[in-house]
């Protein structure tokens, strides 16, 4: 998969204003995800929540004219340190979230390697290789910004 125009490999680190325990408490509110993030629709959880074996299903709508249907299978969830996941659907690959203590806050590290499986998006990846990366990065920026707001507002309660 490496070097393929269909693969988006990502690594990012973000400071968050709350401890790893507080971050985890907010992450557990899966029922709020669709209302938090305008790019997420048709969201549902099959399973007990933020635990291994659960599957998060939804549609991602980046600021481009396409939609991506995904199923995120939680492979391992170690509170409040790590989530490992397999991504399936219009994308296929792996993703990981690490939560490291950083003073009074948290350093969230995200890594993923996902292959675009949807035919129209594969064609777009060949014609405009940076387009999918741009859409991906806008979704990540929006997610982090909104999540910081919910942490500051005390949405863990």
Model regions and ranges:
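Beta-strand/loop substructures that line and gate deep hydrophobic ligand-binding cavities in soluble
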Residues: 86-141
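Hydrophobic/aromatic beta-strand elements that line small-molecule binding cavities or substrate pockets
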Residues: 12-14, 45, 69-76, 94-101, ...
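Residue-level detector of alpha-helix boundaries and kinks
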Residues: 8, 18, 59, 84, ...
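Glycine-rich portal/gate segments that line the openings of hydrophobic small-molecule binding cavities
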Residues: 44-91, 107, 142-157
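Short loop segments at secondary-structure junctions
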Residues: 17-20, 78, 102-104
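Hydrophobic ligand-binding cavity/cleft-lining segments
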Residues: 1-51, 146, 155-157
């Amino acid at each position: 998969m490496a070097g393929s125009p269909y693969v988006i490999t990502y690594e990012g680190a973000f400071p968050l204003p709350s401890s790893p325990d507080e971050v985890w408490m907010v992450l557990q509110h899966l029922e709020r995800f669709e209302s938090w993030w305008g790019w997420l629709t048709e969201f549902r959880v099959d399973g007990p929540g933020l635990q291994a074996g659960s599957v998060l299903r939804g549609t991602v709508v980046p600021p481009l004219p396409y939609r991506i249907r995904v199923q995120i299978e939680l492979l391992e969830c170690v509170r409040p340190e790590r989530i490992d996941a397999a991504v399936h659907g219009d994308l296929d690959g792996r993703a990981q979230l690490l939560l490291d203590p950083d003073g009074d806050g948290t350093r969230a590290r995200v890594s993923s390697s996902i292959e675009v499986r949807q035919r129209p998006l594969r064609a777009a990846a060949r014609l405009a290789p940076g387009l999918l990366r741009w859409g991906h990065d806008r979704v990540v920026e929006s997610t982090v910004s909104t999540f910081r707001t919910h942490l500051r507002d005390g949405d863990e309660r």
